[in-house]
């Protein structure tokens, strides 16, 4: 059998085309991940700038204004400074625990973003147990803080790590019970299904109106999980210098700084998804469909609008969190634990029982 030169060239071209197609499919998998990383980075920088401007307004001072227009590049300048600072390690500390602690805290929080629906069909992984995966992953972060405190070989750092673990356990349980109530109302543990269940009646279909007590408990528990004032006992300056961060410097200290704002952002996003309708607009779907032709496959414009609505609701909660931080005093450790175990836990349990009863009677 004789094969001429043209056929050989066609075969080589076909194999080359298939190779480039496989490379393109592999690279396309990383495009959504890259978009999420860039979006999260910009959001964290925006939150840092907002916090500095809001705190300056509350305290009647100017705030950052020289680094970029209106001081928007101040957070970037601070991050660059931390990147080039010397990375100090305690001579008598556990180097492995000391080094892995910040990384575990940051990675566990970043993984939580994988189940958040930012818009229609704009979610990294739509899992059937999305909200439980978030709770499971977020519970790993205090382990990193405890490792950091123990590995520092410093009494203030160790006490800060113990406080972080105790605080996380105290407020993780009420938060989980509130998520269970939302899952019962939506008949699903998927974040996408929970958002869809709130879309039928627009503004009045939000879980905020059906679960007002659960919303308040979830709000307080989220602030406590973020370890922000009035719940920043693990890093109380007057008592523990900087808590588990005391011995850290350079990029490792920067990781804790980033983890704090990443946690605030992910908590705000879950408040939006679980209680504020996610990416849904406030107009009921029935009324919108009468005026606009809505296809099953939404376009890019609808996705962008959904992302914009999600971010607006999220930054509204972030504004409340920042204002709370700069207006309320810090709780004592006994007040913190009493609030979690004696008030929020019974309220969340009662809310879960009421939700279960209403769902059973509605069958």
Curated annotation (Swiss-Prot):
Q: What biological processes does GO assign it?
A: aerobic respiration; photosynthesis, light reaction
Q: Name one Pfam family in it.
A: NADHdh
Bilayer topology reads: Multi-pass membrane protein
Q: Return the EC number.
A: 7.1.1.-
Q: Which UniProt keywords apply?
A: Chloroplast, Membrane, NAD, NADP, Plastid, Plastoquinone, Quinone, Thylakoid, Translocase, Transmembrane, Transmembrane helix
Q: Any transmembrane segments, and where?
A: 28-48, 98-118, 129-149, 253-273, 300-320, 336-356
Q: In which broad location class does this protein mainly occur, judging by the first location in its UniProt entry?
A: plastid
Annotated Gene Ontology cellular components are: chloroplast thylakoid membrane
EC top class named in words = translocase
Catalytic activity, reaction form = a plastoquinone + NADH + (n+1) H(+)(in) = a plastoquinol + NAD(+) + n H(+)(out); a plastoquinone + NADPH + (n+1) H(+)(in) = a plastoquinol + NADP(+) + n H(+)(out)
Q: Which InterPro entries match?
A: NADH_UbQ_OxRdtase_su1/FPO, NADH_UbQ_OxRdtase_su1_CS
Q: Where is the signal peptide?
A: none
Q: Where does the record place it? A: Plastid, Chloroplast thylakoid membrane
Give this protein's Gene Ontology molecular function annotations.
NADH dehydrogenase activity; oxidoreductase activity, acting on NAD(P)H, quinone or similar compound as acceptor; quinone binding
Concerning its family, UniProt says: Belongs to the complex I subunit 1 family.
Q: How does it assemble?
A: NDH is composed of at least 16 different subunits, 5 of which are encoded in the nucleus.
Protein role: NDH shuttles electrons from NAD(P)H:plastoquinone, via FMN and iron-sulfur (Fe-S) centers, to quinones in the photosynthetic chain and possibly in a chloroplast respiratory chain. The immediate electron acceptor for the enzyme in this species is believed to be plastoquinone. Couples the redox reaction to proton translocation, and thus conserves the redox energy in a proton gradient.
What is the designated name of this protein? NAD(P)H-quinone oxidoreductase subunit 1, chloroplastic
